[in-house]
Amino acid sequence: MWGQLMIKNRFVTKLLITFMVLCFLMVPISGKIILKETENLEVKSDLPTSFDLRYAEGFNYVTPIKSQTGGTCWAHGAMSAMEGNLMMTGNFQSPGEPNLAEYHLDWWNGFNQFNNDDDPLNAGLEVHYGGDYLVSSAYFTRGEGAVYSPDANDGTEADIPWYQTAPARFDPSYDIYYPRDIEWFVAGPNLENIDIIKEKIMTEGVMGTALCISSQFMDGYVHYQPRDSSYDPNHAVAIIGWDDNKLTQADEPGAWLIKNSWGSDWGEDGYFWISYYDKHCGQHPEMGAVSFQNVELLKYENIYYHDYHGWRDTLKGVQEAFNAFVAKGDEQLDAVSFYTATDGVMYEIKIYDDFIDGELRNELYSKTGVIDYTGFHTIDLETPIGFAAGDDFYIYLYLLDGGHPFDRTSEIEVLLVAKSQGIVVKSKARSGESYYKSGSEWKDFFYYPFDDWSHRGTANFCIKALTNSWNPTGSELYCDDVIALSNVKPLSLVEASFSIENIGEPFSNLNWEISEWPDWGTWTFKPKSGSNLKPENGPFNIEVKFLSPSKRDTEFSGEIKIVNIDNPSNYEIVEVTVATSKTRLVSGVAQNLFERLSLKFPNLLNFLNL
């Protein structure tokens, strides 16, 4: 009911959602209970004045210090956060501590001159010299990493085996770790959101961040860049804790404890501090505080997407969008992923079987919920949906606030330790992949009229389908209808209907056809055959038209046979009885001529629109 209300009246929906949030305050999302404002207030009173993930209640949740080669700090910052979450959850599947492959991300992120699937010329970033957390997120959410392989590690802080030469992009020996959620936080100009960041560090582990590293901002391994400084961030690191009483160059105390990637012989055994009041750390919207959460061994065999480069822009003012996909094999849809561009977003996911004449049809699944924080999210389907090879399907996403994140050709604005600025990374799109709702009409995003012509024809929404192999289960044709008509005028056009249904296993596909019908009269069926009818579609109606026999005051009987094409032994019979009246519709020669013409030219009925 809520989904229908949302689509029919957005204004009323906003009022209803506000009322729901104020009344209930608790909304279940993916197995968690998200407390709105009440939760944040409660957490604030319980947070310690200092915290260190290396000594959290007697446990260490930080992997060892690395020594980066080249401009790969961004890869080390992201992997430190991924590894930290794995240590907290215990989801790492190999012996020892997690040691993920920074240089696989460095080579195969898809934004650089070595590899960009969207650009055959491979223009873009220079390998080993640039990236950020949006780049790493695009790579993770495609399911290409994070890679764990013993071959990537040499037991030293440098872990350099894969730096000089690119490793294989895919290898069956790799373990791939996937962050189900990635969240971006901003502490705020008055640190009004700092407790959220602290709570996430305590519950989700190490968090990625960035700063403008410079001797002018560093004093005894304590960093502080004033807010009025114009320098952009140039180095990525990771937050592992804090101290509210740590004195810094800022007017007020308080600092983040930072894990660097310059070896353990730098700083305080590889660590240092950044003031709470730093310009970028905890403040930059894309690099300030990034939490990689619910990291697990990738459990999906395929990830369908059109947004190769992930979240590059947001289409404001649009709430409804969908992506179209075609199953490459027999697969079941187990999860959907997407980004939200603001906090506290109510979403609705729907899966459709068809997009016909500008309308999404045959809804197979729906789910609603609330996403508490900005970022990337993976939503499991309680009941997987099976699709046969070649079957098209459509993932609809309604986002109440913030607009729809999308990929497009873009200039990388935050280019850490890069040799040059203003690098353009090309994306590509095709017509028929992404659609957005404009008024009451679905429009192909491929033709969106961007002001910048270089963006046109390159944009796709960040909506992904996560699938596994599926063994199609048996479909079963069912029909219990009959056609029984009385007092039918001879040689008259008769209209009737019956319905069929697939009562087989969930999400099985029924392919059917009408193979037999009575040999009296002239018959047409709309449609006469069909495919991919699922149990979830419910009854499917078939329209029947026939020219009644010319003989008066007679009862005619016959059968309509519908067959399951994939299992001919599964068929249904619709019994037909027609009793003609004593009165003719026409008489004499005209009647006989009409009958003969109808029999000789079956399309005559359609031509006459009878």
PLM regions: where:
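Catalytic-core signature of thiol
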Residues: 33-332, 342-367, 373, 408, ...
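Beta-sheet-dominated interaction scaffolds and their linkers
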Residues: 312-315, 319, 327-329, 472-504
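Aromatic- and Gly/Pro-enriched, solvent-exposed loop/edge beta-strand patches characteristic
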Residues: 343-429
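Short, surface-exposed loop/turn segments at beta-strand-coil junctions that are enriched for proline
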Residues: 384-386, 547-553
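Surface-exposed binding patches on compact interaction domains or structured appendages
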Residues: 449-452, 472-481, 504-544
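A short beta-strand micro-motif common to beta-rich folds, especially ectodomain repeats
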Residues: 554-566
